[in-house]
Design a protein with these regions (language model features):
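Conserved beta-loop-beta/alpha segment of the NTase-like Rossmann-fold superfamily
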Residues: 2-77, 115-116
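A short, conserved beta-strand element in the Rossmann-like catalytic core
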Residues: 12-13, 38-41, 158, 198, ...
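Residue-level signal for inorganic ion chemistry
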Residues: 22, 37, 51, 74, ...
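Catalytic-core segments of class I nucleotidyltransferases/pyrophosphorylases
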Residues: 30-32, 39, 45-52, 63-68, ...
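Conserved Lys-Pro-Asp/Glu-containing loop-to-beta segment of HAD-superfamily phosphomonoesterases
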Residues: 31, 287-289, 295-325
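Active-site neighborhood of HAD-like aspartate-dependent phosphohydrolases
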Residues: 187-232
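Substrate-recognition element of Asp-dependent hydrolases with the DxDx(T/V) motif
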Residues: 218, 222-258, 268-282, 331
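Acidic, Mg2+-coordinating phosphoryl-transfer loop and its flanking beta/alpha structural elements
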Residues: 319-342
Length: 342
């Protein structure tokens, strides 16, 4: 009702100093903080619902990108709680999840009151330097591991357009309708990929991370999916969990290796689902509670239905690609167009 209000800095205050200068205008409700040089089309109602349901004080919009090796990485646990924020300069693990901060944030104003930053000092010269506030270094990174900053993973369109080259690329995407189509309020199209024998070289039951090897050309194929407007989602049976041959942590590391190797070649996946179950009993070291006839193990279509719900996917406009009969049966059962590869 008050229209657009502006705060003009007389001198540069850093990329977050202005927040403290307008603290009295922010009230008590969460606010949206955006990078001004980004093009985005996001279902913010969905993101805000996530923020409130998880009782977060800060929610970061995160997504995979085509160059995670030189991007800042967000490390989170299985509950999406941010544990680490690795800048481009920080040492990083050998294998990592391709998850990057996109520069869209939902922030509870109370966060500003929790920080040891004196609003009166911002903009003043102290010890020969003007006091500024850096959003990432002084506000967000210190919240890592505290339990109330979460990451919101989404494949929606968010791209920096701060250089002429990036601006023209974004302009081209906008003209093609790609920007608006990626909003999760709209039905999405996906290419579902099996893992073993489709993405990585088939080794039977893959138990050793050192045996994971991308098939030649698969990164280029996935890049084509990334550039097509389709989501790229992996759906894989992993009975090695139920058989007690691989732990959840070991499987997670294998998938981090997959994402790292794809990222080095400029490719990424938008989602990953795996079935840890196995219906047959009698294996030494097996996990009894996982030895069940579930709804997610292919050839049943359960994992595709999970993705349908999470990403608002139109299954009839999507593809299932795999090297086995179970992949084709699952895709057909979900209403996808299925492709068997040799």
């Amino acid at each position: 009702k008050d229209g657009v209000q502006y705060f003009e800095e007389k001198i540069p205050l850093g990329n977050a100093g202005a927040l403290f200068k307008i603290r009295n205008l922010l009230g008590k409700e969460p606010f949206l903080l955006l990078n001004a040089d980004a093009m985005f089309e996001v279902d913010f109602n969905r993101m805000l619902k996530f923020h409130k349901e998880h009782k977060a004080l800060v929610t970061l919009f995160t997504h995979p990108n085509s160059h995670p090796y030189d991007s800042g990485l967000i490390v989170a646990n299985e509950k999406s709680i941010v544990e680490e924020w690795l800048t481009k300069e920080d040492a990083r693990p050998q294998w990592y999840k391709n998850r990057v901060n996109a520069g869209l944030h939902i922030i509870d104003p109370s966060v500003l009151d929790m920080l040891s930053i004196n609003e009166d000092d911002i903009g003043r010269e102290i010890n020969g330097k003007v006091v500024k506030v850096d959003l990432d270094r002084q506000i967000l990174k210190p919240l890592c591991g505290k339990g109330f900053m979460l990451c919101y993973d989404s494949p929606e369109y968010v791209k920096d357009m701060g250089t002429p080259e990036r601006y023209y690329a974004v302009e081209n995407d906008y003209k093609k309708g790609i920007v608006s189509a990626k909003n999760l309020a709209n039905k999405q199209k996906a290419v579902f990929l099996d893992r073993d024998g489709t993405i990585n070289v088939y080794k039977g039951f893959l138990r050793d991370i050192d045996e994971f090897e991308l098939i030649d050309g698969v990164a280029d194929a996935i890049k084509k999916i990334n550039n097509s407007g389709y989501l790229c989602i992996v759906v894989t049976n992993q009975p090695v969990i139920a058989r007690g041959e691989v732990t959840y942590e070991q499987l997670d590391m294998i998938h981090k290796k997959m994402e790292t190797l794809l990222g080095l070649d400029g490719a990424y996946i938008d989602g990953l689902y795996y079935c840890p179950h196995h219906p047959h009993k009698g294996y030494e070291g097996e996990i009894p509670e996982l030895k069940i006839d579930c709804k997610c193990r292919k050839p049943k279509p359960g994992m595709l239905y999970m993705a349908e719900k999470d990403f608002n996917i139109s299954l009839s406009d999507s593809f299932m690609v795999g090297d086995g009969e179970n992949d084709i049966i699952a895709g057909n059962a979900a209403g996808c167009r299925s492709v068997l590869i040799a």
